[in-house]
């Protein structure tokens, strides 16, 4: 090709003119006039918003929320973390149904029983002491003594005892003494069994002959869930879960690092 001459390229045909669609004009009713609201400070009434975040909650609610968040954020040692693994609903229902049969007598029932016994004695029919029926034993000290003497057949511990130090040693003690134990949701549920508001732990010592098979089934299921899994539970730490803000911040940093690396590699 001789110098000074430029190669002529093919001319591209111009794009066809885009045919604009004629939009039909909206008919505006003059009776409906626009009244735009101004939500600035001191202007119109603010719209209804979810202000839960800004409520000044009572102290006990604040504390329980902070405790729940701390349990998520901090590393929770296995001894405390094991109380998050409660018994499944079906087994817990069966257990409570059985425990309901062995509720201790109320103060009124005891009063009536002693009154009837006193009346018999006054009538000269002789005083025959009644045999103590098998009932649930409640309270940390009572249950600890029963476990140490290997008299407890099954120990039920509440998962939400506060302070947790009251019962934190019980699972290890039960395992050492070979007593089956389980952790159940709700100290209030256990409290209802023994006519109190709350209860930390209850224990079965004896049951009637008709309930022995039901208790044996429960003990078998509980033993596989708790006593036999003790080594696994002992290694499992809890918590260490970051909040949404921290997760977002870390994700942002990671994204920036990845972008920087991509530009370096080109």
Swiss-Prot record:
The keyword tRNA processing does not apply. It is found in: Cytoplasm. One of its GO terms (biological process) is maturation of LSU-rRNA. GO terms for cellular component: cytosolic large ribosomal subunit; membrane; nucleolus; synapse. It holds the Pfam family Ribosomal_L7Ae. Keywords: Acetylation, Cytoplasm, Isopeptide bond, Ribonucleoprotein, Ribosomal protein, Ubl conjugation. The modification N6-acetyllysine is found at residues 34, 97, 217. The keyword Protease does not apply. Transmembrane segments: none annotated. GO terms for molecular function: RNA binding; structural constituent of ribosome. SUPFAM superfamilies: L30e-like (SSF55315). Disulfide bonds: none annotated. Belongs to the eukaryotic ribosomal protein eL8 family. Component of the large ribosomal subunit. The ribosome is a large ribonucleoprotein complex responsible for the synthesis of proteins in the cell. This is Large ribosomal subunit protein eL8. It comes from Bos taurus (Bovine). The lineage of its organism: Eukaryota, Metazoa, Chordata, Craniata, Vertebrata.
